[in-house]
């Protein structure tokens, strides 16, 4: 690589030396103003060498030496991707060297870096520039018009490869206004400028004329180390390690003029510095440096003096060295900040627009700036004073801050690099003024951002904006004295920007703020300290200050408003964060204010006890809920309606229909409530669950007794007292441990007015009879055993006793009162009627109770009226939950439950006493005595879903407990009854099924026609024992038996019956025989015309007789019939008797009879010869002539009377249908001829009338006609075959079948579905008849065979419906936009798409649609019929060929 670089360097040096020598020769001869005569063809260099040459020149050449030239001005033009320094010499515009130098400092570029200069776009632009140069070189032969003051431009790096004419007639892409004599040429120039692109407008050449770097460093990083930064600041040469640069030469410059375009508006900017700032003389411009930035290096300043400047300008002071050292040291300390800023602005470079570019003119008095609002205004000429007064404020408002900072940075670096010790005072004063200007601009920008009304800022080139912001960021990082002020402003700006601006805008604003302070900080530089006393500013700077002060008042007002908004926003945000920090650790919600309660009123506490306004629900609603969720919601609403906390004005309670009124009233009273706490006796517990739910009975043995928080004890005072509640729990555990066998009892009420005389609850005999006061804490047994059977009632004057009694009885464990079963359990006067209504509803719903075992034996029933309706024979069974699964039950209790007879009271009492003394554990079942007569318990193997499993022996062995004999088997989750299809012993073998798929995957090399799977029938379930079937026929849910059927449906298979192997499948018949009677010929019957005969054909198959209509008998004796008859052929032994020896030779006999009708002629025409006299002579004989004539005479006898039978039968033909006949005509149309026989004719009597007709002898059977018949037999091969009614339809069906089989097409199709699960594959398909075969698209191996006979329909793309009616995904929309889909009869779908033209897709769809439509003609008999026809055709063709060969 180094060898290649060195070779290129040597080549470039040789080229430069040759151009230098040629240039010197031309200069000596005094022919600088004439066009050059030397050229260097670009074609010989090559593209790669040209690119390297351009890069080398644009980085290595940073100086230009013009000898013998007048002072010239430099105009800095910022192009799209490059900065071209063009020198234009104008002898007419003579200005002071100080003003020229001041303007150069203003327009210079400091530490600029173009990050995108080595991008492919820039290299492409460079190639275009080279092509333009070549084009301009070819135009040098044209006549030129020399001006009095020729304009020239100087290339800073190398001699031009091609010469350029100096005539103003020669035009380039960028033109500046000049004095032309020809107005037409001016118009042409303006038009040319308007038609050029923005990239060409600003440069006559596309070769970058900027500082360049050595070829050895073509690819540099975006960041530099401090050493390289020092070198770039100290030296103006390239960053090449050799420190050597190519000599720069000058060539004539083309005149150019910038005219306004719709994208450009002229803006003038000029700032004149004192003449002392310049080191150059009026006669030489050799000391000037190029103010443009280099292309490759991003962080190298190219306008600082270097080795060459020190040689050319030997007069340098110590102050210059000090200033340079300070700057270098300051930059070394902050270089890492520059790197960070660069990385930060990288994102901004990508998002910037490339359209707007700012052009700062140095020789010209105007600047061109792109604006967002383009106008077609002409170029406006301003004087230097007007441009300062008008254009400078407009430019400051329109352009971004980064542009100004860029210019200021260039100015600052120029001051550092070119000023002397005597000039430092001017620079310091100038910077003081610039600091004030930048403060004003900063406030103006902040106000604009705060009000979200940005000024019209022209967009800049991304490269320009990027390295400008980087330089400004570095300037800010070098500022330490003003850091505190920057942090305050940045904090205010970031707080507001986070809420109002996007992250990208915050980055931009942040960079601008940093630039402002960085620029303001220039006052504190050492350069400013050394010259603080000199305050002599140029006139242009004063004018600029005046113009910028015009907007000062407006900016200050906006600044005040912005600061106020920022302060308020900061306060709000700080308060918000404080509140957030305080709220995070506590998490305490704000509670609503408590309502003001009224005092408790005890007026009339026991009178209005039946008031249900605050109760849960109406009594009739308790049976309505059918599921647990509904019950739970009802309970929740009713608890809230009864609770004072929820009825009050609480925002946490749910507003139900009951609590709405009270809540509204409470809101009106400002927190007070109308709720009156009326203490009343709760005589009824509201129970809401209508369904029976059996809870665990032994839950308090394993865990602590937990009192339920149900709705009916929500207001229980004892429940609210924790100490009392714990005491009750301990007492319950103690009593259960001491007397676990004592059963709770309920008394019977025999009051006459109670309405409960006929309802008895069997209870135990209590041991004690005493009233327990409310203040005593009662245990469970104290409560449940203190009431006897001696007509003693519970006290009804306390609330707690009744409520505790019901609750503790329910939680006793041995007797379970489900809340859904007991609608009301009050012990007052209204209990009887409520409980009677409940029993009626209970009987209607076929629900029952779980009762204690001590009451089971006391079941009494009215023997006078018995009406049995077994509960377990209903359509459903109740299932207990798995909590009491397999719970043992005493055998004697179960025996009493199953007994149908009753026992007297003495036996019941005896049994009860025995049970009390006998220790046992288990489930108690209480019996409810009721007068309802239509409910009884009969003997059965299952009761309420409980199955009784009896032991094999009646007597159980010793040591076996009572609970071991009989257990409760429950069908809760059907775990014990997994009904798998199997073949049990002594069961019928299941019917085999044939499962066929609409498509089947074909293995490579083994393509099968059928893919059958034999499975067991799901209908055959393993039979159960007799004990199980007695009580569980209705217990098995239908969904269980249908589970596997549903699984099969999801597997997308079609099930068809298959013929068993051991049993012959029975068909309804053997098939259908079609007989077509074509004609009867050679009929031996004369005198048809005179008898006016008619005929009919009678068809008799032994079962049915069919007769054709009567028609006229033709005179010629040939009858054309053309009648078809359908004849089902039964099996041979179907009509046989029990004797197996007698077999018929034929299946059926078909008789065809010809019947005739005729009219007897009334008269008979007889020919007679009549003798007619002709004349008579007088003396002669009479003459006669003989005439023949026909006369009618009454016939003596008719010959037809002896030809017909009495029913008119004349001829008969019997067709014997046997195996041979069927074999000959099977699936084939055969033509046959049969003789029709007359066996009814008689011999006529010679003496007419001597004998009667039936006494005459018969003639022997003889042939009277010939019968032509076509027969075809369609044999049945499947019980599901359907045959047409007419033979003419057979031919049509066969023709349609042939048409289907002849359909053929092949091509590539995209397949989705079928054997491809979750993927799409392109395959080669062949459609042949009803078979669609898929092959691998490359290897053509068989992959899938699709049976189109199972396709029900073919859908187009618009008819295809996605699953669940949803929209199709994007992949399907792209790949299957114009597709078609096959829908099978089992729901399977396969989608196809053809990657071809629309005509080809339509052809695929039409042919598949035609095949599916012709599926109705596809039956087994059709296929066999066509095969037989094909065989006959082949035989006929073979015979014909043999005959031709023989001949």
From Swiss-Prot:
<dbReference type="GO" id="GO:0005621">
    <property type="term" value="C:cellular bud scar"/>
</dbReference>
<feature type="compositionally biased region" description="Basic and acidic residues">
    <location>
        <begin position="1"/>
        <end position="16"/>
    </location>
</feature>
<comment type="function">
    <text>Required for establishment of the axial budding pattern in haploid cells. Cooperates with other bud site selection proteins to recognize a spatial landmark during mitosis and they subsequently become a landmark for downstream polarity establishment factors that coordinate axial budding and cytokinesis. Involved in the septin organization at the bud neck.</text>
</comment>
<feature type="modified residue" description="Phosphoserine">
    <location>
        <position position="81"/>
    </location>
</feature>
<feature type="compositionally biased region" description="Polar residues">
    <location>
        <begin position="538"/>
        <end position="548"/>
    </location>
</feature>
<feature type="modified residue" description="Phosphoserine">
    <location>
        <position position="616"/>
    </location>
</feature>
<feature type="region of interest" description="Disordered">
    <location>
        <begin position="272"/>
        <end position="316"/>
    </location>
</feature>
<feature type="compositionally biased region" description="Polar residues">
    <location>
        <begin position="22"/>
        <end position="32"/>
    </location>
</feature>
<keyword id="KW-0131">Cell cycle</keyword>
<dbReference type="InterPro" id="IPR001849">
    <property type="entry name" value="PH_domain"/>
</dbReference>
<feature type="modified residue" description="Phosphoserine">
    <location>
        <position position="91"/>
    </location>
</feature>
<feature type="modified residue" description="Phosphoserine">
    <location>
        <position position="167"/>
    </location>
</feature>
<dbReference type="GO" id="GO:0005935">
    <property type="term" value="C:cellular bud neck"/>
</dbReference>
<feature type="modified residue" description="Phosphoserine">
    <location>
        <position position="367"/>
    </location>
</feature>
<dbReference type="GO" id="GO:0005525">
    <property type="term" value="F:GTP binding"/>
</dbReference>
<feature type="modified residue" description="Phosphoserine">
    <location>
        <position position="811"/>
    </location>
</feature>
<feature type="modified residue" description="Phosphoserine">
    <location>
        <position position="10"/>
    </location>
</feature>
<comment type="subunit">
    <text>Interacts with AXL1, AXL2, IQG1 and SEC3.</text>
</comment>
<feature type="region of interest" description="Disordered">
    <location>
        <begin position="648"/>
        <end position="673"/>
    </location>
</feature>
<keyword id="KW-0132">Cell division</keyword>
<feature type="region of interest" description="Disordered">
    <location>
        <begin position="1"/>
        <end position="38"/>
    </location>
</feature>
<dbReference type="GO" id="GO:0000142">
    <property type="term" value="C:cellular bud neck contractile ring"/>
</dbReference>
<feature type="modified residue" description="Phosphothreonine">
    <location>
        <position position="365"/>
    </location>
</feature>
<feature type="compositionally biased region" description="Basic and acidic residues">
    <location>
        <begin position="549"/>
        <end position="580"/>
    </location>
</feature>
<feature type="region of interest" description="Disordered">
    <location>
        <begin position="444"/>
        <end position="479"/>
    </location>
</feature>
<feature type="compositionally biased region" description="Polar residues">
    <location>
        <begin position="648"/>
        <end position="664"/>
    </location>
</feature>
<dbReference type="GO" id="GO:0031106">
    <property type="term" value="P:septin ring organization"/>
</dbReference>
<feature type="region of interest" description="Disordered">
    <location>
        <begin position="57"/>
        <end position="76"/>
    </location>
</feature>
<feature type="compositionally biased region" description="Polar residues">
    <location>
        <begin position="277"/>
        <end position="316"/>
    </location>
</feature>
<feature type="modified residue" description="Phosphoserine">
    <location>
        <position position="78"/>
    </location>
</feature>
<feature type="modified residue" description="Phosphoserine">
    <location>
        <position position="511"/>
    </location>
</feature>
<dbReference type="GO" id="GO:0097271">
    <property type="term" value="P:protein localization to bud neck"/>
</dbReference>
<feature type="modified residue" description="Phosphoserine">
    <location>
        <position position="96"/>
    </location>
</feature>
<dbReference type="GO" id="GO:0007120">
    <property type="term" value="P:axial cellular bud site selection"/>
</dbReference>
<feature type="region of interest" description="Interaction with IQG1">
    <location>
        <begin position="768"/>
        <end position="879"/>
    </location>
</feature>
<dbReference type="Pfam" id="PF00169">
    <property type="entry name" value="PH"/>
</dbReference>
<protein>
    <recommendedName>
        <fullName>Bud site selection protein 4</fullName>
    </recommendedName>
</protein>
<dbReference type="InterPro" id="IPR011993">
    <property type="entry name" value="PH-like_dom_sf"/>
</dbReference>
<feature type="modified residue" description="Phosphoserine">
    <location>
        <position position="805"/>
    </location>
</feature>
<feature type="region of interest" description="Disordered">
    <location>
        <begin position="529"/>
        <end position="591"/>
    </location>
</feature>
<feature type="compositionally biased region" description="Polar residues">
    <location>
        <begin position="59"/>
        <end position="76"/>
    </location>
</feature>
<dbReference type="InterPro" id="IPR052007">
    <property type="entry name" value="Bud4"/>
</dbReference>
